[in-house]
Structures are given as structure tokens and as C-alpha cells.
Amino acid sequence: MGESRAARPLEAEALRLGLELGMTLIDTAEMYGEGEAERIVGEVIAGRRDRIFLVSKVYPHNASRKGAVAACERSLRRLGTDHLDLYLLHWRGSIPLDETLEAFESLRHAGKILDHGVSNFDLDDMVEAEALPGGERLASNQVLYNLSRRGIEHDLLPYCRERGIPVMAYSPVGQWRLLRHPALKAVASRRGVSPARIALAWLLAQDGVVAIPKATQPDHVRDNRAAIDLTLTPEDLGALDAAFPPPKARVPLAML
């Protein structure tokens, strides 16, 4: 989102439709379109900010004590709001974690963010972060997770569940590559719905997981909303597990 000026009207329309359909979590980042995505979101949420759970993310190279504060303030201006519900470190960089967490705590005490968390953190990163001041308040870890990328189920997801840290799953339909898999298409055909709806319904059924599918077109938004009401049968789940088995050993965290 925000990468093409020509696409902005359709992207804004998709966001508005999502809000009208009751999908009120909006995830963005200063990286997306180098701030343009935040500007689009700001235009759409004007006048209805109180209905929305707003998430944004800071670049790792901006995540110093002063840099994160300045980056957050820029995001707030682009979004046209005075606070974020959740502010995440987009991925781990060279700036020490304790410095980033200190900045997040400063922003929280100033009322500019309500909670903070991380993105693309593997298990060892989470353990390290939680041991630092402010790390005990981690409110989410946003990671790549879908039927074809189930590596987090071995250790990271159980760790987060045990500590009550929600996992936000990005790319829940595998950037559309997953949707061409014969097994997924077979389940979708049997249920009379799209493969994307099956993939999202599977993810939504996972305990402690919030799916954040990309939706820049209204028809994608409608399909995403419909996935909420779809319950997969034991037969569906068995077929999906056979085609996309859970991990038997630890694998490195996948990232996009």
C-alpha cells in the first residue's frame, strides 16, 4: 500500500470497506511506501479513530532512544492521530534492544503509544528482549505464518502462548503462492469457497494468533471478512495437515 499514486483510491476504498464490515485492526509501518501507506490510512480513519486498533512499525535504523521517538512522531503526523495502540520494532537491527525498549517506554509514558512489541523476532530474540527493562511488556510479535510456513509452531508460538503474547501473522495466504496448491484448492472446492478463505479460516482457528492479511482491493476485503464465519471441519483440517505438516524440529524463522 502507498507504493503507487494511481492505486491510492482503490486502496482507500478497500480500507473503508474493511472498517464498514467490522475489521477494525489496521497494521501499517513507516516503511510501507516510505510513509505513504500511513498517509492513506490517516485519510481513511479521519473522524473514526476511536473505532480502530492502530498498529505501526519503526525501521530498525530509526530505533534508537531519540530516533524511535522522532519516527513515532512522524508516523503520528502522517496518520493524523495523537497515539498508536501498538508500536512495533519492524525487525531486529544493529541498535541494542535495551535502547529501543527504553524509547518505547518513553513513548508509552508520554501517551503516544499504548503498547509496544516486536516483529520478525525468533525465540532467542524474544527471550533476550523479555529479560530487558520494558521487555516484560511486549504486547505482540508479528511474524510470517501461514499453512506453508508453520515453523513457529515448534517453539516460538508455544512460547508466546505460554506468556500470553499474541502472535500477529503476516502474509497469511503466502503472497498468493499458497493459493495455487492442489490440496488447498481441493478443500476450497469441496466447501464452495475460495482458497484464500480456507487459508485464513485455518489461521484464525489457531489459538493466540491474529491474522493480518493484505487487502488492497474490495473483493479481497470481502473474502477476508467471510473467512471469520467459516469453520473448518475435521476432514478439512486433516487434509490441510497432510499437505502442510507441522514442523518436527526447529527451523529458522522465515521472514519477508
For the regions a protein language model found, what residue spans apply to each?
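N-terminal binding-site loop/beta-alpha segment at the start of enzyme catalytic domains
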Residues: M1-I52, I165, M255-L256
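Active-site mouth loops of central-metabolism enzymes
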Residues: M1-P9, S56-K66, H90, I95
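Short, acidic/polar
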Residues: R5-G18, S64-L79, M126-V127
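Acidic (Asp/Glu)-rich catalytic clusters
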Residues: L19-E20, G42-D50, E73-D82, E105-R108, ...
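Glycine-centered flexible beta-alpha turn that most often forms the glycine-rich phosphate-binding loop
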Residues: I26, L84, H116
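Active-site groove signature of glycoside hydrolases
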Residues: L79-I95
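Beta/alpha (TIM)-barrel catalytic core signal, keyed to glycine-rich beta->alpha loops juxtaposed to Asp/Glu
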Residues: R92-L256
